[in-house]
Amino acid sequence: MFDSTLNPLWQRYILAVQEEVKPALGCTEPISLALAAAVAAAELEGPVERVEAWVSPNLMKNGLGVTVPGTGMVGLPIAAALGALGGNANAGLEVLKDATAQAIADAKALLAAGKVSVKIQEPCNEILFSRAKVWNGEKWACVTIVGGHTNIVHIETHDGVVFTQQACVAEGEQESPLTVLSRTTLAEILKFVNEVPFAAIRFILDSAKLNCALSQEGLSGKWGLHIGATLEKQCARGLLAKDLSSSIVIRTSAASDARMGGATLPAMSNSGSGNQGITATMPVVVVAEHFGADDERLARALMLSHLSAIYIHNQLPRLSALCAATTAAMGAAAGMAWLVDGRYETISMAISSMIGDVSGMICDGASNSCAMKVSTSASAAWKAVLMALDDTAVTGNEGIVAHDVEQSIANLCALASHSMQQTDRQIIEIMASKAR
Protein backbone atom coordinates (compact mmCIF):
# COMPACT_ATOMS: atom_id res chain seq x y z
CA MET A 1 0.00 0.00 0.00
CA PHE A 2 1.09 3.57 -0.59
CA ASP A 3 1.44 6.36 1.93
CA SER A 4 -1.83 8.35 1.98
CA THR A 5 0.11 11.45 3.03
CA LEU A 6 1.82 11.61 -0.37
CA ASN A 7 0.47 14.05 -2.91
CA PRO A 8 -2.22 12.49 -5.14
CA LEU A 9 -0.08 12.50 -8.30
CA TRP A 10 2.69 10.55 -6.61
CA GLN A 11 0.14 8.09 -5.27
CA ARG A 12 -1.02 7.44 -8.84
CA TYR A 13 2.56 6.95 -10.00
CA ILE A 14 3.09 4.33 -7.31
CA LEU A 15 -0.20 2.63 -8.16
CA ALA A 16 0.79 2.55 -11.84
CA VAL A 17 4.01 0.75 -10.94
CA GLN A 18 2.22 -1.64 -8.59
CA GLU A 19 -0.27 -2.49 -11.34
CA GLU A 20 2.30 -2.88 -14.12
CA VAL A 21 5.29 -4.37 -12.30
CA LYS A 22 4.22 -7.82 -11.10
CA PRO A 23 5.70 -11.31 -10.77
CA ALA A 24 4.97 -13.50 -13.79
CA LEU A 25 5.86 -17.15 -14.32
CA GLY A 26 6.32 -17.87 -18.02
CA CYS A 27 5.82 -15.73 -21.11
CA THR A 28 2.73 -13.65 -20.45
CA GLU A 29 0.83 -14.33 -23.69
CA PRO A 30 0.58 -18.12 -23.19
CA ILE A 31 0.08 -17.41 -19.50
CA SER A 32 -2.92 -15.20 -20.29
CA LEU A 33 -4.54 -18.13 -22.06
CA ALA A 34 -3.54 -20.48 -19.23
CA LEU A 35 -5.25 -18.11 -16.79
CA ALA A 36 -8.43 -18.05 -18.86
CA ALA A 37 -8.40 -21.86 -18.89
CA ALA A 38 -7.72 -22.08 -15.15
CA VAL A 39 -10.57 -19.73 -14.27
CA ALA A 40 -12.89 -21.60 -16.64
CA ALA A 41 -11.90 -24.91 -15.03
CA ALA A 42 -12.68 -23.47 -11.61
CA GLU A 43 -16.20 -22.69 -12.82
CA LEU A 44 -16.75 -26.09 -14.43
CA GLU A 45 -18.73 -28.84 -12.75
CA GLY A 46 -16.47 -31.88 -12.83
CA PRO A 47 -13.01 -32.55 -14.30
CA VAL A 48 -11.91 -31.00 -17.59
CA GLU A 49 -12.19 -33.42 -20.50
CA ARG A 50 -11.68 -31.03 -23.42
CA VAL A 51 -10.32 -27.51 -24.01
CA GLU A 52 -11.15 -25.13 -26.84
CA ALA A 53 -9.46 -21.74 -27.12
CA TRP A 54 -9.43 -18.70 -29.35
CA VAL A 55 -6.84 -15.91 -29.34
CA SER A 56 -6.07 -12.69 -31.19
CA PRO A 57 -3.48 -12.79 -33.99
CA ASN A 58 -1.00 -10.88 -31.81
CA LEU A 59 -1.41 -13.32 -28.94
CA MET A 60 -0.99 -16.22 -31.36
CA LYS A 61 2.23 -14.59 -32.61
CA ASN A 62 3.63 -14.42 -29.11
CA GLY A 63 2.58 -17.95 -28.21
CA LEU A 64 3.84 -20.01 -31.13
CA GLY A 65 7.48 -20.41 -30.18
CA VAL A 66 7.85 -19.93 -26.45
CA THR A 67 8.43 -22.65 -23.85
CA VAL A 68 5.80 -23.08 -21.15
CA PRO A 69 7.52 -23.43 -17.73
CA GLY A 70 7.95 -26.95 -16.43
CA THR A 71 6.68 -28.65 -19.58
CA GLY A 72 9.60 -28.59 -22.00
CA MET A 73 7.00 -27.84 -24.69
CA VAL A 74 6.29 -24.73 -26.71
CA GLY A 75 3.02 -23.18 -27.78
CA LEU A 76 -0.44 -22.19 -26.69
CA PRO A 77 -2.07 -25.67 -26.61
CA ILE A 78 0.10 -26.91 -23.73
CA ALA A 79 -0.44 -23.60 -21.91
CA ALA A 80 -4.22 -23.96 -22.24
CA ALA A 81 -4.16 -27.61 -21.19
CA LEU A 82 -1.94 -27.05 -18.17
CA GLY A 83 -3.92 -24.00 -17.11
CA ALA A 84 -7.10 -26.06 -17.20
CA LEU A 85 -5.68 -29.08 -15.36
CA GLY A 86 -3.09 -27.58 -13.02
CA GLY A 87 -3.56 -23.83 -12.94
CA ASN A 88 -4.21 -21.68 -9.88
CA ALA A 89 -7.17 -19.52 -10.89
CA ASN A 90 -6.35 -16.94 -8.22
CA ALA A 91 -2.65 -16.47 -9.03
CA GLY A 92 -2.86 -14.09 -11.98
CA LEU A 93 0.33 -14.14 -14.05
CA GLU A 94 1.69 -16.87 -11.76
CA VAL A 95 -1.20 -19.16 -12.67
CA LEU A 96 1.14 -22.13 -13.29
CA LYS A 97 3.22 -21.76 -10.13
CA ASP A 98 1.50 -24.70 -8.38
CA ALA A 99 1.37 -27.05 -11.37
CA THR A 100 2.46 -30.52 -10.29
CA ALA A 101 4.29 -33.19 -12.26
CA GLN A 102 1.00 -35.10 -12.44
CA ALA A 103 -0.85 -32.07 -13.81
CA ILE A 104 1.85 -31.60 -16.46
CA ALA A 105 1.59 -35.28 -17.43
CA ASP A 106 -2.20 -35.04 -17.59
CA ALA A 107 -1.99 -31.91 -19.75
CA LYS A 108 0.37 -33.63 -22.18
CA ALA A 109 -1.96 -36.64 -22.31
CA LEU A 110 -4.95 -34.40 -23.05
CA LEU A 111 -2.94 -32.80 -25.83
CA ALA A 112 -1.86 -36.16 -27.25
CA ALA A 113 -5.49 -37.32 -27.26
CA GLY A 114 -6.43 -34.40 -29.52
CA LYS A 115 -8.64 -32.84 -26.86
CA VAL A 116 -7.09 -29.36 -27.02
CA SER A 117 -7.54 -26.82 -29.82
CA VAL A 118 -6.34 -23.22 -30.12
CA LYS A 119 -7.47 -21.08 -33.03
CA ILE A 120 -7.29 -17.44 -34.08
CA GLN A 121 -10.46 -15.57 -33.15
CA GLU A 122 -12.13 -14.30 -36.31
CA PRO A 123 -13.08 -11.56 -36.61
CA CYS A 124 -11.02 -9.96 -33.84
CA ASN A 125 -10.64 -6.24 -33.26
CA GLU A 126 -8.70 -6.70 -30.03
CA ILE A 127 -4.91 -6.74 -29.87
CA LEU A 128 -4.88 -8.86 -26.72
CA PHE A 129 -7.69 -11.42 -26.63
CA SER A 130 -7.83 -14.91 -25.17
CA ARG A 131 -10.86 -17.12 -24.62
CA ALA A 132 -10.86 -20.60 -23.12
CA LYS A 133 -13.82 -22.97 -23.06
CA VAL A 134 -13.52 -26.16 -21.03
CA TRP A 135 -15.85 -29.14 -21.20
CA ASN A 136 -17.02 -31.99 -19.01
CA GLY A 137 -19.46 -34.00 -21.09
CA GLU A 138 -22.15 -31.51 -22.09
CA LYS A 139 -21.28 -29.11 -19.29
CA TRP A 140 -18.95 -26.22 -20.08
CA ALA A 141 -17.45 -22.99 -18.77
CA CYS A 142 -15.96 -20.18 -20.82
CA VAL A 143 -13.72 -17.25 -19.81
CA THR A 144 -12.69 -14.28 -21.95
CA ILE A 145 -9.73 -11.98 -21.31
CA VAL A 146 -9.42 -8.72 -23.25
CA GLY A 147 -7.06 -5.74 -23.22
CA GLY A 148 -4.73 -6.87 -20.44
CA HIS A 149 -3.15 -10.23 -19.70
CA THR A 150 -5.29 -10.77 -16.59
CA ASN A 151 -8.28 -8.57 -17.47
CA ILE A 152 -11.21 -11.01 -17.33
CA VAL A 153 -14.22 -9.43 -19.00
CA HIS A 154 -16.66 -12.34 -19.21
CA ILE A 155 -17.34 -15.66 -17.47
CA GLU A 156 -20.13 -17.94 -18.66
CA THR A 157 -21.18 -21.54 -18.10
CA HIS A 158 -23.84 -23.83 -19.54
CA ASP A 159 -26.11 -22.45 -16.81
CA GLY A 160 -25.70 -18.82 -17.88
CA VAL A 161 -23.56 -15.70 -17.44
CA VAL A 162 -21.54 -15.63 -14.21
CA PHE A 163 -19.74 -12.32 -14.69
CA THR A 164 -19.50 -9.48 -17.21
CA GLN A 165 -17.17 -6.54 -16.73
CA GLN A 166 -18.96 -3.21 -16.81
CA ALA A 167 -17.46 -0.89 -19.41
CA CYS A 168 -18.70 2.38 -17.94
CA VAL A 169 -16.87 4.30 -15.22
CA ALA A 170 -18.96 5.13 -12.19
CA GLU A 171 -19.54 8.79 -11.46
CA GLY A 172 -16.88 10.13 -9.12
CA GLU A 173 -14.55 7.19 -9.73
CA GLN A 174 -10.89 8.12 -9.99
CA GLU A 175 -9.08 7.89 -13.31
CA SER A 176 -6.83 4.90 -13.72
CA PRO A 177 -3.16 5.37 -12.85
CA LEU A 178 -2.20 4.81 -16.50
CA THR A 179 -4.60 7.54 -17.63
CA VAL A 180 -3.01 9.92 -15.14
CA LEU A 181 0.46 8.81 -16.26
CA SER A 182 -0.38 9.59 -19.88
CA ARG A 183 -0.59 13.29 -18.98
CA THR A 184 2.70 13.50 -17.12
CA THR A 185 6.24 14.15 -18.35
CA LEU A 186 9.66 12.63 -17.81
CA ALA A 187 10.65 15.75 -15.88
CA GLU A 188 7.77 15.20 -13.44
CA ILE A 189 8.70 11.53 -13.11
CA LEU A 190 12.28 12.50 -12.28
CA LYS A 191 11.09 14.98 -9.64
CA PHE A 192 9.01 12.21 -8.07
CA VAL A 193 11.95 9.79 -8.05
CA ASN A 194 14.24 12.37 -6.45
CA GLU A 195 11.83 13.46 -3.74
CA VAL A 196 9.50 10.57 -2.85
CA PRO A 197 10.19 8.99 0.57
CA PHE A 198 12.25 5.82 0.24
CA ALA A 199 9.73 3.84 2.30
CA ALA A 200 7.05 4.47 -0.33
CA ILE A 201 9.08 2.87 -3.12
CA ARG A 202 11.08 0.23 -1.25
CA PHE A 203 8.85 -2.45 -2.82
CA ILE A 204 10.52 -1.95 -6.22
CA LEU A 205 13.62 -3.70 -4.84
CA ASP A 206 11.66 -6.94 -5.30
CA SER A 207 12.21 -6.54 -9.05
CA ALA A 208 15.96 -6.80 -8.46
CA LYS A 209 15.54 -9.84 -6.22
CA LEU A 210 13.38 -11.81 -8.66
CA ASN A 211 15.18 -10.89 -11.86
CA CYS A 212 18.65 -11.41 -10.37
CA ALA A 213 17.60 -14.94 -9.38
CA LEU A 214 16.40 -15.53 -12.93
CA SER A 215 19.68 -14.16 -14.29
CA GLN A 216 21.70 -16.46 -12.07
CA GLU A 217 19.66 -19.42 -13.30
CA GLY A 218 20.24 -18.35 -16.89
CA LEU A 219 24.01 -18.32 -16.35
CA SER A 220 23.84 -22.07 -15.74
CA GLY A 221 23.68 -22.37 -19.53
CA LYS A 222 20.70 -24.73 -19.51
CA TRP A 223 18.09 -22.38 -20.91
CA GLY A 224 17.10 -20.96 -24.28
CA LEU A 225 19.95 -19.77 -26.48
CA HIS A 226 22.16 -19.45 -23.35
CA ILE A 227 23.44 -16.09 -24.62
CA GLY A 228 24.48 -14.88 -21.19
CA ALA A 229 26.39 -18.08 -20.41
CA THR A 230 28.00 -18.09 -23.85
CA LEU A 231 29.21 -14.51 -23.56
CA GLU A 232 30.58 -15.27 -20.10
CA LYS A 233 32.55 -18.18 -21.57
CA GLN A 234 33.98 -15.88 -24.22
CA CYS A 235 35.15 -13.54 -21.47
CA ALA A 236 37.03 -16.45 -19.92
CA ARG A 237 38.59 -17.21 -23.32
CA GLY A 238 39.71 -13.62 -23.70
CA LEU A 239 37.48 -12.97 -26.70
CA LEU A 240 35.33 -10.48 -24.79
CA ALA A 241 36.39 -8.03 -22.12
CA LYS A 242 34.93 -8.65 -18.67
CA ASP A 243 33.91 -5.11 -17.87
CA LEU A 244 30.84 -3.13 -16.90
CA SER A 245 29.49 -3.03 -20.45
CA SER A 246 29.74 -6.79 -20.96
CA SER A 247 28.37 -7.49 -17.47
CA ILE A 248 25.25 -5.47 -18.29
CA VAL A 249 24.66 -7.54 -21.43
CA ILE A 250 25.58 -10.91 -19.88
CA ARG A 251 23.44 -10.64 -16.77
CA THR A 252 20.47 -9.12 -18.58
CA SER A 253 20.42 -11.64 -21.43
CA ALA A 254 20.92 -14.53 -18.98
CA ALA A 255 17.68 -13.63 -17.23
CA SER A 256 15.88 -13.59 -20.57
CA ASP A 257 17.47 -16.93 -21.52
CA ALA A 258 15.97 -18.52 -18.43
CA ARG A 259 12.67 -16.74 -18.87
CA MET A 260 12.12 -17.77 -22.48
CA GLY A 261 13.66 -21.21 -22.05
CA GLY A 262 11.00 -22.27 -19.56
CA ALA A 263 12.72 -21.94 -16.18
CA THR A 264 10.27 -22.34 -13.30
CA LEU A 265 11.23 -19.04 -11.68
CA PRO A 266 9.09 -15.90 -11.90
CA ALA A 267 10.25 -12.71 -13.57
CA MET A 268 9.22 -9.32 -12.29
CA SER A 269 7.35 -8.07 -15.34
CA ASN A 270 6.73 -4.58 -16.68
CA SER A 271 3.70 -3.63 -18.78
CA GLY A 272 2.61 -7.27 -18.94
CA SER A 273 5.97 -8.59 -20.15
CA GLY A 274 8.67 -10.49 -18.30
CA ASN A 275 11.33 -9.48 -20.80
CA GLN A 276 10.40 -5.83 -20.41
CA GLY A 277 10.68 -6.23 -16.65
CA ILE A 278 14.08 -7.90 -17.00
CA THR A 279 15.30 -5.19 -19.38
CA ALA A 280 14.13 -2.40 -17.08
CA THR A 281 15.75 -4.07 -14.07
CA MET A 282 19.02 -5.86 -14.76
CA PRO A 283 21.11 -3.11 -16.43
CA VAL A 284 20.24 -0.78 -13.54
CA VAL A 285 21.17 -3.42 -10.95
CA VAL A 286 24.54 -4.09 -12.59
CA VAL A 287 25.43 -0.39 -12.74
CA ALA A 288 24.23 0.14 -9.16
CA GLU A 289 26.46 -2.70 -7.96
CA HIS A 290 29.40 -1.26 -9.90
CA PHE A 291 29.07 2.05 -8.07
CA GLY A 292 28.30 0.48 -4.69
CA ALA A 293 24.84 2.04 -4.52
CA ASP A 294 22.85 1.39 -1.35
CA ASP A 295 19.27 0.12 -1.33
CA GLU A 296 17.77 3.59 -1.46
CA ARG A 297 19.74 4.67 -4.54
CA LEU A 298 18.99 1.37 -6.22
CA ALA A 299 15.28 1.72 -5.45
CA ARG A 300 15.15 5.24 -6.87
CA ALA A 301 17.01 4.19 -10.01
CA LEU A 302 14.75 1.16 -10.47
CA MET A 303 11.66 3.28 -9.91
CA LEU A 304 12.83 5.74 -12.57
CA SER A 305 13.56 2.89 -14.97
CA HIS A 306 10.29 1.02 -14.46
CA LEU A 307 8.08 4.12 -14.37
CA SER A 308 9.75 5.59 -17.47
CA ALA A 309 9.31 2.27 -19.29
CA ILE A 310 5.63 2.21 -18.32
CA TYR A 311 5.22 5.85 -19.34
CA ILE A 312 6.62 5.16 -22.82
CA HIS A 313 4.85 1.81 -23.30
CA ASN A 314 1.58 3.39 -22.22
CA GLN A 315 1.62 5.27 -25.53
CA LEU A 316 1.84 1.99 -27.48
CA PRO A 317 -0.65 -0.79 -28.19
CA ARG A 318 -0.36 -3.55 -25.56
CA LEU A 319 1.14 -5.78 -28.26
CA SER A 320 2.56 -4.52 -31.55
CA ALA A 321 5.21 -5.06 -34.23
CA LEU A 322 7.66 -2.98 -32.19
CA CYS A 323 9.90 -5.00 -29.86
CA ALA A 324 9.09 -3.50 -26.48
CA ALA A 325 12.41 -4.58 -25.01
CA THR A 326 13.61 -1.42 -26.74
CA THR A 327 11.20 0.82 -24.84
CA ALA A 328 11.95 -0.97 -21.57
CA ALA A 329 15.64 -0.34 -22.25
CA MET A 330 14.86 3.35 -22.60
CA GLY A 331 13.68 3.16 -19.01
CA ALA A 332 16.91 1.34 -18.11
CA ALA A 333 18.91 4.09 -19.82
CA ALA A 334 17.12 6.63 -17.63
CA GLY A 335 17.84 4.62 -14.48
CA MET A 336 21.51 4.10 -15.34
CA ALA A 337 21.98 7.75 -16.31
CA TRP A 338 20.45 8.79 -12.98
CA LEU A 339 22.88 6.57 -11.08
CA VAL A 340 25.91 8.00 -12.86
CA ASP A 341 24.89 11.62 -13.29
CA GLY A 342 21.36 12.34 -12.11
CA ARG A 343 20.67 15.27 -14.43
CA TYR A 344 17.50 15.46 -16.50
CA GLU A 345 19.53 16.53 -19.54
CA THR A 346 21.63 13.37 -19.41
CA ILE A 347 18.55 11.18 -19.02
CA SER A 348 16.68 12.83 -21.90
CA MET A 349 19.72 12.64 -24.19
CA ALA A 350 20.14 8.94 -23.45
CA ILE A 351 16.50 8.22 -24.30
CA SER A 352 16.73 10.27 -27.50
CA SER A 353 19.79 8.30 -28.60
CA MET A 354 17.96 5.05 -27.88
CA ILE A 355 15.10 6.18 -30.12
CA GLY A 356 17.64 6.98 -32.83
CA ASP A 357 19.28 3.56 -32.43
CA VAL A 358 17.03 0.55 -31.80
CA SER A 359 13.55 1.92 -32.52
CA GLY A 360 13.07 -0.17 -35.66
CA MET A 361 13.48 -3.58 -34.00
CA ILE A 362 10.47 -5.77 -34.79
CA CYS A 363 8.64 -8.18 -32.53
CA ASP A 364 8.37 -11.48 -34.39
CA GLY A 365 6.78 -13.37 -31.54
CA ALA A 366 7.94 -14.58 -28.16
CA SER A 367 10.75 -17.14 -28.39
CA ASN A 368 14.25 -17.92 -27.17
CA SER A 369 15.57 -15.31 -29.59
CA CYS A 370 13.93 -12.58 -27.50
CA ALA A 371 17.07 -12.79 -25.37
CA MET A 372 19.04 -11.57 -28.39
CA LYS A 373 16.85 -8.49 -28.63
CA VAL A 374 17.05 -7.97 -24.87
CA SER A 375 20.86 -8.09 -25.00
CA THR A 376 20.95 -5.68 -27.94
CA SER A 377 18.62 -3.25 -26.17
CA ALA A 378 20.60 -3.40 -22.91
CA SER A 379 23.85 -2.75 -24.77
CA ALA A 380 22.31 0.16 -26.68
CA ALA A 381 21.03 1.66 -23.42
CA TRP A 382 24.48 1.75 -21.84
CA LYS A 383 26.00 3.13 -25.06
CA ALA A 384 23.38 5.89 -25.04
CA VAL A 385 24.23 6.72 -21.42
CA LEU A 386 27.95 6.91 -22.19
CA MET A 387 27.23 9.25 -25.09
CA ALA A 388 25.01 11.44 -22.93
CA LEU A 389 27.71 11.68 -20.27
CA ASP A 390 29.89 13.20 -22.99
CA ASP A 391 27.07 15.61 -23.86
CA THR A 392 26.42 13.74 -27.11
CA ALA A 393 23.10 12.42 -28.42
CA VAL A 394 21.10 11.81 -31.56
CA THR A 395 19.58 15.20 -32.31
CA GLY A 396 16.35 16.55 -33.71
CA ASN A 397 18.04 16.89 -37.09
CA GLU A 398 18.14 13.12 -37.49
CA GLY A 399 15.38 10.67 -38.36
CA ILE A 400 12.34 10.41 -36.10
CA VAL A 401 14.17 12.00 -33.18
CA ALA A 402 12.89 15.48 -32.31
CA HIS A 403 14.57 18.34 -30.45
CA ASP A 404 12.36 17.52 -27.44
CA VAL A 405 12.50 14.05 -25.86
CA GLU A 406 8.74 13.99 -25.26
CA GLN A 407 8.12 14.56 -28.97
CA SER A 408 10.70 11.92 -29.83
CA ILE A 409 8.79 9.41 -27.70
CA ALA A 410 5.51 10.47 -29.32
CA ASN A 411 7.04 10.00 -32.79
CA LEU A 412 8.25 6.50 -31.96
CA CYS A 413 4.91 5.48 -30.49
CA ALA A 414 2.99 6.91 -33.46
CA LEU A 415 5.14 4.82 -35.77
CA ALA A 416 4.43 1.66 -33.78
CA SER A 417 0.73 2.41 -33.31
CA HIS A 418 -0.07 3.23 -36.93
CA SER A 419 2.49 2.56 -39.65
CA MET A 420 3.76 -0.72 -38.19
CA GLN A 421 0.31 -2.34 -38.19
CA GLN A 422 0.96 -3.66 -41.70
CA THR A 423 4.36 -4.89 -40.53
CA ASP A 424 2.61 -6.78 -37.76
CA ARG A 425 0.19 -8.41 -40.20
CA GLN A 426 3.09 -9.47 -42.43
CA ILE A 427 4.98 -10.96 -39.48
CA ILE A 428 1.92 -12.93 -38.36
CA GLU A 429 1.35 -14.16 -41.93
CA ILE A 430 4.95 -15.37 -42.21
CA MET A 431 4.82 -17.11 -38.84
CA ALA A 432 1.46 -18.73 -39.60
CA SER A 433 2.80 -20.12 -42.88
CA LYS A 434 5.73 -21.67 -41.00
CA ALA A 435 3.37 -23.29 -38.50
CA ARG A 436 1.31 -25.03 -41.16
Swiss-Prot record:
Pfam families: SDH_alpha (PF03313). Disulfide bonds: none annotated. GO terms for biological process: L-cysteine catabolic process to pyruvate. InterPro entries: Ser_deHydtase-like_asu, UPF0597. One of its GO terms (molecular function) is L-cysteine desulfhydrase activity. It comes from the Bacteria. PANTHER family: UPF0597 PROTEIN YHAM (PTHR30501:SF2). Belongs to the UPF0597 family. This is UPF0597 protein YhaM. It comes from Escherichia coli O9:H4 (strain HS).
